[in-house]
């Protein structure tokens, strides 16, 4: 299950610099709009210290972490919803992602131009939000006309549910709010909402790009964004992308840690961002551990054992019999699977077991 996040923002806010930090691919970080014309795509690993600690005990042939696909989407501009700049193409690229990483410029630097001439991340956020909202309204109005006719002609229950969902979204978007602020109670409404694939319904992480001096505590710009994000239930984080790029170029782990300590940081902003993006979509990890490999597998929080078995192979889900489960802490404390069995800590779970983050799983199946 590959997580796909799109990095968006106005030109020259630090998107490509951030992408360079996240991925080994080098996007062209140029000081002019549209330097990212085709979306740059990079596959990055999700940091997970548990895999390394397990590998020290299991001695596998390899370690396979979970991965996340990052797409650097070219700079949006005012009017993108009407095709300004490269608007239609950019908005289409956003639609293909699972979550949005919205980069906002929260630093002063007279050597880096801003398309509107001044630094105002609140205004920048509103520009991008407005373009996405206008595109969503266009989608809704087109769909609403069609579904209203279907609901009226045949007394179609599904069409009526979708009409109610569309009208709820329309009312919110017309107020300049994002679709993600709307909550639906029934499963039917939730399913109808999910199938619309609205841009502003996607989970979003607002990344406040700051200078090195503000890397630890943020600044007045970031605090304004935090207040706005709280109102719509969105996540925020502070990162100094240029500094992170410098850290990424250091050779040794020790040098990187020393640099972070000098800034008063325990973990790199890149690692924090990847973890936040992972949790943004309500994703967790279970682990398989053996002589061949220690591997992280991604699943949706709340999934039961058969569904997680299906992540490895569809046959595992179809022929699921049971799951043998070891808690990560037990494995680390006792040192081996044999010791866990001997201590009576190996769980035998059936089809109703809800898998927990960090569970070490072995599935029994028959096809």
Regions found by a protein language model. Name each.
Residues 1-113, 122, 141, 147:
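Conserved G1/Walker A P-loop phosphate-binding module
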Residues 2-8, 13, 19, 146-354, ...:
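C-terminal-of-GTPase-core extension/linker across diverse P-loop GTPases
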Residues 24-25, 50-51, 75-77, 105-111, ...:
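Conserved nucleotide-binding/hydrolysis micro-motifs of P-loop NTPases
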Residues 30-31, 112-116, 218-220, 250:
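Short amphipathic alpha-helical segments
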Residues 57, 100-103, 131, 143, ...:
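Amphipathic, soluble alpha-helical interaction motifs
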Residues 76-83, 117-132, 151-157, 213, ...:
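Flexible beta-alpha connector loops of hexameric P-loop NTPases
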Residues 96, 356-357:
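Short, flexible surface segments
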